[in-house]
Amino acid sequence: MAVEKLADSSKDWKSEHKALTMKVNIAGEEVLLAKPQTYMNLSGEAVQALMTWYKVKVDHLLVFSDDINLDVGRIRCRKDGSHGGQNGLRNIIEHVGDKFPRIRFGVGKCPPKFDLSNWVLAKFSPEDRPAFEEAISKVPALVECYFKLGIEKCMERYNGK
């Protein structure tokens, strides 16, 4: 969802290296958007393949992910760090290391006796949907902040919002 907020509706997604990609301009920078087409837990395969093909350094990677440890609609920006139990991030870290910035979007805790993978793929309840949509609507401004001012400024502006 977050990547779609950055996409150019006049362009088509291209299938390559286990991902759908699109080049866009953000804050004067040419940016490669990517949506891995692997299983979520294998996202690192697509990320590593694209980074190798396009010769992208790990510190030029920006990853969006969901986070069940954040309330719905909360945003957390990080310069680097652990996977925090998120299997897609875990796989990316296994493939390229952990020295890349990431933006996490809260999806709330998984209810007891509910399958976690079904929880993160499920539609939001009518009560939670507005909070998540508000968070996702901040993506263009957040990413522009990242390119113009850096991840630290994004952390100041958006963490906990």
For each feature predicted by the language model, list its residue ranges.
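Gly/charged, well-structured mid-domain segments that form the phosphate/adenylate-handling core
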Residues: 107
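Nucleotide and nucleotide-moiety/phosphate-recognizing core
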Residues: 1-80, 90, 94-103, 111-115, ...
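Conserved TIR/SEFIR loop-to-helix hotspot centered on a Trp-containing motif
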Residues: 83
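Active-site PLP attachment segment
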Residues: 86
